[in-house]
């Protein structure tokens, strides 16, 4: 979805086996509908959700509300079973910004930090969603 909004590379993937090879996210150079939007994230937003969050922020599409993402962005190989029932996966592709910063281990920050409130949730309210709606309403003309 982000690729329809941007014509310059905003993220690269680097292979462990070929450190000098960098692959950009696919780029679509069509037209995009520009509407007000807000992105919600939390510490459970991982993998492509973190990539989407990074692109959303870099492209200045709108504010990001909630909590920083977890920082889990590596591409891994197949699952290798262990004798005790566990297993391992080997990371082989890292996701890198144009400035060379790896996303792995560094949660994507938010513009409006709103911690989940379990008491509000028990009352039938979602304080993070409420904050996101407030931010969106500021942008609707």
Which residue ranges define each predicted feature?
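Cysteine-centered nucleophilic/redox motifs
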Residues: 37, 45-60
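Short, well-structured beta-strand/strand-turn elements
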Residues: 59-73
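Loop/turn elements at helix/coil->beta-strand transitions in domains of secreted/extracellular proteins
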Residues: 33-36, 60-63, 139
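Intrinsically disordered, Ser/Thr/Pro/Gly-rich linkers and terminal tails that flank
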Residues: 1-7, 13-16, 48-54, 67-68, ...
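Bimodal feature
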Residues: 25-26, 58, 72, 138-141
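Gly/Ser/Thr-rich loop/hinge elements
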Residues: 1-40, 44, 73-82, 92-96, ...
């Amino acid at each position: 979805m982000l690729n329809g909004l941007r014509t310059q590379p905003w993220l690269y993937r680097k292979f462990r086996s070929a450190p000098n090879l960098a692959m950009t996210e696919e780029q679509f150079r069509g037209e995009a509908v520009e509407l007000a939007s807000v992105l919600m994230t939390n510490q459970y937003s991982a993998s492509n959700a973190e990539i989407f969050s990074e692109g959303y922020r870099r492209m200045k599409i709108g504010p990001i509300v909630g909590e920083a993402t977890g920082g889990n962005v590596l591409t891994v190989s197949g699952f290798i079973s262990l004798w005790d029932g566990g297993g391992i996966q080997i990371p082989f592709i890292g996701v890198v910004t144009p400035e060379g910063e790896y996303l792995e281990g560094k949660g994507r920050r938010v513009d409006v930090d709103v911690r989940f409130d379990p008491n509000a949730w028990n009352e039938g309210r979602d304080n993070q969603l409420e904050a996101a709606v407030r931010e969106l309403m500021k942008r609707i003309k």
